[in-house]
Each structure stands twice: as C-alpha cells, then as structure tokens.
Amino acid sequence: MHAGLQFGSRFVVPPMQGMIYDYLPEHLLERVRNLGAFAGILALDKWTCNANGRQATFWKRSRERKFTVSFIDQGYCFNAGEWSFPDSPLRGVYARNDVYREVSGWESFQPWLGNIESMDEPTIWRCAEEIPTAWYGESCELERLVEILGRRRARVAELILEFRNSSRAPFPKWRDVVN
C-alpha cells in the first residue's frame, strides 16, 4: 500500500454485540439465513473477473442463532487492478462447494444475474463515476472498463456454466429444464 485514498469499511456487527467468523463448518451452513447470496456474488465475480477466491465472513448478533454471510475483499476484481479479464472456471469462486449446494438452476441466480444482464451502460457509468480518479489514472482507462463490463453482461451465464461443468461439480442439485 502507498499513500493516497484508501477504502475501509466498518464491522458488520460491533465486536461487543456479536461474533464474526471467517469459517463455518458444513453443519452450521444450514443456519446461514442468506446462503443463496453465494449464487449472487458468483454472478458478480464472474462479471468482474475476480481473480481471487471469493472471501466471506459469517456473523451473528449475540442472542441470534442464525448467521448472515457478508462478502469481503473485492480487490482482485478486474484481475487485481490489471483491468484485464482472463476468465477461468475456478476464478472468483468460494473455496468450498457446500455453499452452492442449494443451487438448482438459473432461478437460483435471480435476481442478481438478471440485474447484471439488464443493466444499461448509463447505470454502469453512474457507478464508475464514483471511483476516485487516483484509482484509475486516465479517463480512457475508465471508459475502456465500462465498455468491457457492458459487453461482459451477456457472458456471465456462460461463465457460470463453465464453473458448473468444471471438475469441481459445484451444483449437485442443478437440474436442466427441457422445453
């Protein structure tokens, strides 16, 4: 890290009001209230070419039994600041298949996949305009990134299928629907 504008975030739950875990054993995953969000973040990671394994924290307030998953560290999106997109089926995925065990088909990726696919370029631009200039340098670089993200919207489902068909076989409940 070097001097300049940096990003920091708050705790998802204040330390005196709950617990935060970076790992939950498989038997506790049934107590994660938003486990389906792993499908949503997978769609985002495929769209943005997250070159790192997906990182997550699980948290709960002191008196709660259920956990909530929050996704952290998007620093390797756009191939770790290279702003290139060398796709690979196992890029940007969580290390354990059990978080994907309830994925049963394309409906499991909604509304996230639909939102990505239908996002128009002006919306992408509104998000991009929030990025500090110091983080990207030349405006032509930001323009290039927005153009690439616009084109990649149509590829996200294909990239998810590549992961589905990979040696990991992450979606045991996936069923193909034949019309």
Predicted regions and their residues:
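Residue-level signal for well-ordered alpha-helical segments
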Residues: 18, 24, 28-33, 101-105, ...
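C-terminal catalytic region of ATP-dependent kinase domains
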Residues: 61-179
